[in-house]
Design a protein with these regions (language model features):
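A non-catalytic alpha/beta surface segment that caps or lines the substrate-entry region
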Residues: 46-107
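Second-shell loop/turn segments in exported
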Residues: 22-24, 41-51, 91-95, 132-141, ...
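Extracytoplasmic/secreted proteins, especially bacterial periplasmic and envelope-associated proteins
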Residues: 26, 30-33, 37, 51-66, ...
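His/Asp/Glu-rich mid-to-C-terminal helical/loop segments that flank catalytic regions of hydrolases
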Residues: 272-323
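Bacterial N-terminal signal peptides
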Residues: 6-18
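Metal-dependent peptidase/peptidase-like ectodomains
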Residues: 113, 160, 170-264, 268-270
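Alpha-helical metal-binding/catalytic segments enriched in His/Glu/Asp
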Residues: 104-106, 120-176, 296
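N-terminal capping segment at the start of a domain
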Residues: 25-55, 67-73, 79, 125-126, ...
Length: 323
């Protein structure tokens, strides 16, 4: 199985040329290559806590290393594994009692340790192979994982930043935010040092009701982060689906429960292909996805290089009792 993993990663690397400090724009070729690997047939949908999920995490870790990122402080590896609680759902999925999920975490040191840390994240798992049907999860959430990878590449290539930036891709989100919850309680840095967490979820297609190129941010009114990033040029707007409770349904919530200012950015969150076998690379809008990721580069760079610390507004502050 290790040979299989290394072969997959080596094939994926073949699509890339060396990164120079001048190459700091989001690259559609990189976006497509990441998507094609993560949501390709070989990984069978990256089912939560499966070997395919572990291969996806190893791929992300290898990319982090190639960008010049380091393992997080105190870690000797880019990978973190977490136990998966036994539930009726894990039994139905046939997961073993000792199943574990895998997070991939990379760290870009800043020049001012006192300035805090910016956390950029996504979940890398999906539904996987369900009774012989493969749910590839190209939009949910190979697209968010790809966004993290491209931002990591661009931000690392553009030189040093004042703040350290941590990039995390979590496992087992589909089983109930398991990877991110474990990360939140076993973080490599004090959570009080995390200035903000921006999570990416389903950025592979535009919502037809938004202005061209716009994205939504969950919990927009819960902190000053969204309005400030929008003022800096981020094409984000408030979540138009409050009844769906998207703020509580993605990995940002695990960090928000720990007191971190944390939000998720999405494209078409109610897309009809969600959790269907039609969520494939063929249905990804690569032009939109590339523009969407690029639209966050300048605002995130500003956040990484400045002194602004977003504050919670007290609007719907989460409690430790999960929905």
């Amino acid at each position: 199985m290790l040979v299989r993993t290394i072969t997959f990663i080596a094939l994926a690397f073949a699509s890339f040329s060396p990164v120079s400090a001048a190459a700091v724009a989001v690259d559609r070729a990189h976006v497509e290559a990441h998507e094609n690997f993560l949501a390709g047939d070989a990984l069978k949908g990256r089912g939560s806590a499966t070997n395919d999920e572990a291969i996806a995490a190893a791929y992300v870790a290898s990319q982090f290393q190639s960008f010049g990122l380091r393992p997080p402080p105190g870690w000797t590896s880019f990978l973190q594994t977490a136990p998966v609680p036994v539930t009726d759902r894990t039994r139905k999925l046939g997961l073993p009692k000792n199943a574990r999920t895998t997070n991939a975490v990379g760290f870009l040191p800043g020049t001012d340790p006192a300035a805090g840390i910016l956390l950029i994240s996504a979940h890398l798992d999906h539904l996987g192979d369900v009774r012989g049907e493969v749910f590839h999860g190209a939009n949910d959430n190979a697209s968010g994982t790809t966004a993290v990878l491209e931002l990591a590449r661009v931000l690392a290539a553009s030189g040093s930043h004042k703040r350290s930036i941590m990039f995390a891709c979590y496992g087992a989100e589909e089983l109930g935010l398991i990877g991110s919850s474990y990360f939140g309680s076993h973080a490599p840095v004090p959570l009080r040092d995390i200035v903000a967490n921006i999570e990416f979820e389903m950025v592979g297609a535009p919502d037809p009701q938004f202005a061209s190129g716009s994205l939504m941010m969950t919990g927009f009114d819960r902190s000053t982060l969204g309005p400030t990033l929008r003022a800096r040029g981020a094409l984000i707007m408030p979540d138009p689906y409050p009844e769906e409770k998207f703020f509580e349904r993605s990995d940002n919530y695990s960090l928000a429960l720990e007191g971190v200012v944390a939000h998720t950015i999405s494209g078409w969150a109610t897309i009809p292909t969600l959790h269907t076998t039609a969520d494939t690379v063929a249905n990804i809008d690569f032009a939109f996805m590339t523009r969407a990721i690029q639209s966050l580069v300048e605002p995130v760079t500003w956040l990484a290089d400045g002194d602004f610390r977003p504050q919670g507004t007290g609007e719907g502050a989460p409690s430790k009792v999960k929905p």
